[in-house]
Amino acid sequence: MTGPQPPVYGTARGPLARLASPLAARARQRRHAQFFALTGVAQGAKVLDVGCGQLGLRALEPEMDVTGVDVLPQPGYPGPFVLADPAEGLPFADGEFDLVYCNSVIEHIPPARRQAFAAELRRVGRGWYVQTPAWSFPVEPHALLPGAQWLPARWRKHYWKLGAAGGWEDISLLRKGELEELFGGPVFGERMGRLVKSWISVRRSTHREATVREGVDVVGEADHEEH
C-alpha cells in the first residue's frame, strides 16, 4: 500500500520536468520493488529514513516502522522525526535500526563531509540502502540538463539556471567507486535502457523477509565498469 506521492522533481522546472515526471514516477516504483529484493527487509523492521523530507519512504510504505531524519524541520512528517545532521552525529545507539534508508541524498552532502556522514549511517544501521544518481548518466537529474554535472564550475552556474530553480553548488554526483569507498560493496546499478541511472549500495538487513518478493528484476553489481 502506498500513500500520497511527493513531487518527483523538486528542483527542475519547465516543460521537460513535466514530461519527465511520469517516467520518473514509474522508475521510483520499480526502484522501490528493488529495495525489498535487495535488502530483504521485513515489514516489521525498524527503519531510519535519512533525508526524509516531507514524506520520503513513508510515501511508499506508510505502515512501516520508519523514523525520519532531516537537516530541515518537517512539521508535517507523518511519524517519528528527528532534526539532525548525520555528519555531526545522530542521537541513536549503535545498530539501533534494522535498516538505514537514504535515497538521493548523499550527492547533496559536501564531499569533505561524506566520510563522517557515511560512518554515522553505518554506525546506527545493521543494514543499509543508499541510492544516488550516477555521475556517468548523461542527464543531470536535479536540473534535467544534459551533461550539467560534467561542466567546469564557471560554466555550470550559468547553464544550471536554464533547468533548475535551486543552486548547483550543493550538488556533486558520485561515481561508483566513490560510493564503494564510503559504504563498501556490493554496489548495484539501476538502469535506464543500457545506461546506469543510479548507484545503490546495499548491506542486507538482519531483519529479513522469509522469502524475497517475486517478479523483481534486480540488476547486478557488475553491470557497469565505471569507477
Question: What would you call each of these model-derived segments?
Answer:
Residues 1-40:
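Class I SAM-dependent methyltransferase Rossmann-like catalytic core
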Residues 17-21, 159-169:
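Short glycine/proline- and acidic residue-enriched helix-loop micro-motifs
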Residues 28-29, 110-111, 172:
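A conditional alpha-helix N-cap/helix-loop micro-motif detector
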Residues 36-137, 203:
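Conserved SAM-binding loop
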Residues 127-154:
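Conserved class I S-adenosyl-L-methionine
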Residues 165-185:
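Short alpha-helix
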Residues 185-195:
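Conserved S-adenosyl-L-methionine
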Residues 195-227:
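C-terminal lobe and adjacent flexible extensions of AdoMet/dcAdoMet transferase-like proteins
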